[in-house]
Amino acid sequence: MLLSAPLRHLPGLLLLLWPLLLLPSLAAPGRLARASVRRLGTRVPGGSPGHLSALATSTRAPYSGGRGAGVCKSRPLDLVFIIDSSRSVRPLEFTKVKTFVSRIIDTLDIGATDTRVAVVNYASTVKIEFQLNTYSDKQALKQAVARITPLSTGTMSGLAIQTAMEEAFTVEAGARGPMSNIPKVAIIVTDGRPQDQVNEVAARARASGIELYAVGVDRADMESLKMMASKPLEEHVFYVETYGVIEKLSARFQETFCALDQCMLGTHQCQHVCVSDGDGKHHCECSQGYTLNADGKTCSAIDKCALSTHGCEQICVNDRNGSYHCECYGGYALNADRRTCAALDKCASGTHGCQHICVNDGAGSHHCECFEGYTLNADKKTCSVRNKCALGTHGCQHICVSDGAVAYHCDCFPGYTLNDDKKTCSDIEEARSLISIEDACGCGATLAFQEKVSSHLQKLNTKLDNILKKLKVTEYGQVHR
C-alpha cells in the first residue's frame, strides 16, 4: 500500500521527465553529430565493447562542397531501400526513415538511364512499395516514399533481403542486366534483431552481385548487421543511436555514390583535353593536329608532311601547332589553292635585273641579253658597247672611227682622200697627176693615161693584198686568243 501511491504517479512523472531524457538528442549540432557515432571502448547494442562505427573509421577522402560543387555526379545505380517498419519503429521514427530515404534520393540523378529506385517495406511480412521501373521522375519518386505506411509487427530481415533479390532486382522489375555494368545496391535500415536467418540469404544476395549496406538504429543487433553487409564492413555498416539523427547519414551515402569528375577537379593529368565519361571515369584526347601517345595522357604533333596526304605540290612544312603549310621552290610562287605552284615570270614582273633584254626560259628561269652592238658583262646582267673598230673587222684602209654602238666610218691619213668604196684611200698628188693637160684626144695622151691607170691599179692591188694579209692575221689572233 505504501508503494502503490508512488507507482500510480509514475506515468505522469515519466511524462514530465521525458524532455530531459531527450536532451542529448537536442544538443548542439556538433555534439549531436558526435553522439551519432559509437567510439572505441563504448558498448554498441548487440555488439561487444571496442566496436568502431563505419562513420568513424572511413578512410575515404571526405566529400566537400556538395553537389553544387560541380565535381560530383552520382553514378547510375539500381538502388533498393529495404526499410524496417515493425512495431518497434514508432510513427515519428518511421517518418525520419522516409526523410532519410528522400534525402539520399535528392543527391542522386534519377531517370531511366540514371539511377532507378525501389522500396521494400518489411516487418513480419514483406511489401514491395514500388519497383525500379515505376518512377523515373525524382519528385514523383519522393512523393511515393512519403506515402509509405508502417506494416506493424515482426522483423523478418532475411525474408526482406530474399524478396528484394528475387523480385526487386529482376529485369522485369526494372533492374538492368549484367552487360550494362550498372551496380546493384541495397540499403537495409533496421532497429532490432532479425527474427529469421539472415546470414545465408545475405550471402546469396552478395554472390548475385548486390552490394549490401546495413544501417542499424538504437537496439539494432551489430552482429546481424555485419552478417548482412558487404565487405569491407567499415564501409558498409553504419550505426546511429536514434532515428532523430539518421538523416545525417544521407551525406555519407552521397559521398559513397558520388563519382568525382576528375576533369573538373584538374587531377586528370591529360596534357591537352580531358573528357568525362561519367561514373567518375575519364579519358584524354589531343588538340587538332596531335595524336595521343601510348601513355594515354600526353600528345605528340602529327607529322602531316610524312603522311603524304598533305597535297603540297613541291614543299610541305610542318608547323608547331601540329598543322602544316605548303611552299614552292625558288622561281615559283604558291597559287591561290595554297598547295600548287606556278613558275614566276621574272621578265614580266620586272624583277629580272637585266639592263637590256630579259629572256624567259620557262620553269621560273631566265637570262639576260644585250642590244646589237653591245656585249653582256661578267655579271650576266649589264651590257657594254661593242667597239667594231677595235675588233679589226671594219675594213678601213687607214682609220676606223666609231659612231656609237653599231656604227662606224672610215677616214684617211693626211694627204689622202677616201675613195668611193668608203674604205680605201688615194694619194691626193697621184690623183692630180692623173689629170693630163695634153690634148685628151691625142694618141700620146690616151696612151699615157692608160699606163698611169695600169700603174695605179697595180699599186692598188698590192695594197689590197697587204690588207688581206693583215685581216687574216687579225682573224687568226681573234680565234686563238
UniProtKB/Swiss-Prot annotation:
The modification Omega-N-methylarginine is found at R193. Residues 259-300, 301-342, 343-384, 385-426 form the EGF-like domain. Pfam families: cEGF, EGF_CA, Matrilin_ccoil, VWA. Its main location: secreted. The modification Phosphoserine is found at S436. Disulfide bonds join C263-C274, C270-C284, C286-C299, C305-C316, C312-C326, C328-C341, C347-C358, C354-C368, C370-C383, C389-C400, C396-C410, C412-C425. Residues 451-475 form a coiled coil. Strongly expressed in growing skeletal tissue such as epiphyseal growth plate or in bone undergoing growth and remodeling. In the bone, actively synthesized in osteoblasts and osteocytes. Expressed in cartilage of sternum, femur, vertebrae, trachea, articular and epiphyseal cartilage, cartilage of developing bones and bones. SMART domains: EGF, EGF_CA, Matrilin_ccoil, VWA. Residues 78-253 form the VWFA domain. Keywords: Coiled coil, Disulfide bond, EGF-like domain, Glycoprotein, Methylation, Phosphoprotein, Repeat, Secreted, Signal. GO terms for cellular component: extracellular matrix; extracellular region; matrilin complex. Residues 1-27 form the signal peptide. The keyword Ligase does not apply. Major component of the extracellular matrix of cartilage and may play a role in the formation of extracellular filamentous networks. PANTHER family: COLLAGEN ALPHA, MATRILIN-3. Can form homooligomers (monomers, dimers, trimers and tetramers) and heterooligomers with matrilin-1. Interacts with COMP. Component of a complex containing at least CRELD2, MANF, MATN3 and PDIA4. This is Matrilin-3.
